[in-house]
Amino acid sequence: MSFISNPNIHFYLLAYFIGGIPFGYLLSRFFYNINLQEVGSGSIGATNVLRALKERDPKKAKMMAALTMLLDALKGALVILVAKMAGMSVETQWAIAVLAVVGHCFSPYLKLEGGKGVATGLGVMAVMLPLEAAIGLVVWLVVGKTLKISSLSSLLGLGALLISSFLIHPEIPEIGTHAPLLIIAFVIFYKHIPNLVRLFQGKEGRVV
């Protein structure tokens, strides 16, 4: 089978380019003429959407942030679901999951800049490891509600998802390794390094 006609390659490209769609950037630009890369943390995710819009349109800021999060999660989940319906192997589905998150974090439409990967990561995990994704989501919600620090709640939720995955599945079904999950976790952690620096300096902003 040639490179061009290989359906796996088609899905890998689809995952990266759909994962790279910067919904937060597009929504803020289209409705408010705000360039998310020039405000707040410069990220294109829901948290920065909320921060950027709070002063401009406080009544709709949370709604736009929630919409951004939903779209970012769906773009990761939908590509995998289509791959499942097309009969792609579990190995291919995991590769798609990784590439969707990489696409979001290093978007081809924004000169390889992007978001933190949390919502897209949650979307792909909801399909691949739904129980672990639910555990991570609960931790993220509880910590976020209590401490109101988005980066910390995201990383603790990620940690909970990782730990629970090893406890529930010592070997990930059908692939026998946690490697794709660890790659996704590494990418998300890497994108949060500036947040961790600010956190240790006491400069990380809270989200109200």
Curated annotation (Swiss-Prot):
Family that this chain belongs to: Belongs to the PlsY family.
Known function: Catalyzes the transfer of an acyl group from acyl-phosphate (acyl-PO(4)) to glycerol-3-phosphate (G3P) to form lysophosphatidic acid (LPA). This enzyme utilizes acyl-phosphate as fatty acyl donor, but not acyl-CoA or acyl-ACP.
Location in the cell: Cell inner membrane
Record flagged with keyword Transmembrane: yes
Alphabetized GO MF terms: acyl-phosphate glycerol-3-phosphate acyltransferase activity
One record GO biological process: phospholipid biosynthetic process
Membrane topology, as annotated: Multi-pass membrane protein
Main location: membrane
Pfam families: G3P_acyltransf
Transmembrane segments: 7-27, 63-83, 86-106, 123-143, 149-169, 170-190
GO CC list: plasma membrane
Species of origin: Wolinella succinogenes (strain ATCC 29543 / DSM 1740 / CCUG 13145 / JCM 31913 / LMG 7466 / NCTC 11488 / FDC 602W) (Vibrio succinogenes)
Catalytic activity from the UniProt record: an acyl phosphate + sn-glycerol 3-phosphate = a 1-acyl-sn-glycero-3-phosphate + phosphate
Protein name from the UniProt record: Glycerol-3-phosphate acyltransferase
Keywords: Cell inner membrane, Cell membrane, Lipid biosynthesis, Lipid metabolism, Membrane, Phospholipid biosynthesis, Phospholipid metabolism, Transferase, Transmembrane, Transmembrane helix
Coiled-coil residues: none
Subunit (UniProt): Probably interacts with PlsX.
Pathway noted in the entry: Lipid metabolism; phospholipid metabolism
The protein's Enzyme Commission number: 2.3.1.275
Database matches in PANTHER family: GLYCEROL-3-PHOSPHATE ACYLTRANSFERASE-RELATED, INNER MEMBRANE PROTEIN YGIH
